[in-house]
């Protein structure tokens, strides 16, 4: 009962201009500039985000996730040494990063009408992949570092 109501709550008001502003950094520069020029929405644009904090928090989150997965699967998957663990998590993390780029960002996000602002309905305006590719490229070293840290943690575990 809790999960369906949580899903309904998070889905509520999706596709509205205010809700779309939460993902403001994902929009192409052309869209961001149009939002800044919009009298109503420019006041609601989220404050800038410190990218160093975002990268560090992503590394911490994925190191914890990889560490938990590794601790659970250490003997099942046969992680016998650092390199086994590191390669597994490196492949897993980079595959996740690539999936996010191709499926979520390039195939879904740019083509769904839910992410469009009411005053910019043209699909063509949302097609510039630069922000998504930049995010993917930032993810490569982040996932590599998370894999490295998780592999180190697994080496310490009995």
What residues fall within each predicted segment?
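Juxtamembrane/disordered regions of integral membrane proteins
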Residues: 1-158
């Amino acid at each position: 009962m809790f999960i369906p109501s949580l899903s309904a709550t998070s889905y509520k008001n999706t596709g509205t201009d205010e809700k779309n502003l939460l993902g403001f950094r994902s929009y192409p520069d052309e869209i961001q500039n149009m939002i800044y020029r919009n009298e109503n929405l420019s006041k609601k644009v989220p404050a800038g985000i410190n990218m160093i904090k975002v990268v560090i928090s992503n590394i911490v989150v994925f190191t914890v996730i990889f560490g938990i997965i590794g601790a659970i699967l250490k003997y099942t998957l046969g992680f016998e040494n650092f390199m086994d663990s590191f390669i597994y998590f490196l492949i897993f993390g980079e595959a996740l990063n690539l999936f996010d780029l191709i499926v979520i960002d390039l195939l879904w996000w740019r083509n769904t009408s839910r992410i469009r602002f009411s005053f910019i309905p043209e699909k063509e305006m949302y097609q510039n992949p630069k922000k998504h590719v930049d995010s993917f490229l930032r993810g490569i070293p982040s996932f590599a570092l998370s894999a490295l840290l998780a592999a180190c943690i697994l080496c310490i575990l009995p």
